[in-house]
């Protein structure tokens, strides 16, 4: 069984390939011509399923027998921002790039009079294939701070300190991050489903 990742985000592709290294993984643009997918769901799970369905439906009939489309939708929910940016994490600012998104998060927090806040990451993994549709979830709790620290990672990693740590995700090694991340937890559950489907 082959897995096609329903993302063109290079950081996510690397992270997903590392965690799913027991499987034959292909990035979206290694198999298909890139196309835009409108993420108009109201939850992480809905958006993950929208992306996985779109990629699976773009495969030809032969490819559909060989591939399962796997998608991740994830984001950060900040308590003092009433759970925002949530599903809009990747496009929180007008520019929609990581730095602008982080800057907006910090500015919104400071506007409310806070220099840190409890927060959590959520990841939803969706898998779509001829055998059906499946999804898993993972969370990671901690806090966001108002000063970026660390060079690793992407997204909001340089602002997020996981519970039980005194470093941001961007200060942790890839292995340290992968062992505690929301995406890792959701993918560990997804791997169980994928192994069962592979036997079937």
Curated annotation (Swiss-Prot):
Cofactor(s) required, per the database record: Mg(2+)
SUPFAM superfamilies the UniProt entry points to: ITPase-like (SSF52972)
Gene3D superfamilies assigned to the protein according to its UniProt record, in alphabetical order: 3.90.950.10
Ligand binding (substrate): 7-12, 74, 154-157, 177, 182-183
Binding residue positions for Mg(2+): 38, 73
Domain of life per record: Bacteria
Cofactor: binding comment: Binds 1 Mg(2+) ion per subunit.
GO cellular component entries: cytosol
Top EC class of this enzyme: hydrolase
UniProt keyword list: Hydrolase, Magnesium, Metal-binding, Nucleotide metabolism, Nucleotide-binding
Reactions this protein catalyses: XTP + H2O = XMP + diphosphate + H(+); dITP + H2O = dIMP + diphosphate + H(+); ITP + H2O = IMP + diphosphate + H(+)
InterPro entries (UniProt xref): dITP/XTP_pyrophosphatase (IPR020922), ITPase-like_fam (IPR029001), RdgB/HAM1 (IPR002637)
Active-site residues annotated for this sequence: 73 (proton acceptor)
Function: Pyrophosphatase that catalyzes the hydrolysis of nucleoside triphosphates to their monophosphate derivatives, with a high preference for the non-canonical purine nucleotides XTP (xanthosine triphosphate), dITP (deoxyinosine triphosphate) and ITP. Seems to function as a house-cleaning enzyme that removes non-canonical purine nucleotides from the nucleotide pool, thus preventing their incorporation into DNA/RNA and avoiding chromosomal lesions.
Family per record: Belongs to the HAM1 NTPase family.
Protein name as annotated: dITP/XTP pyrophosphatase
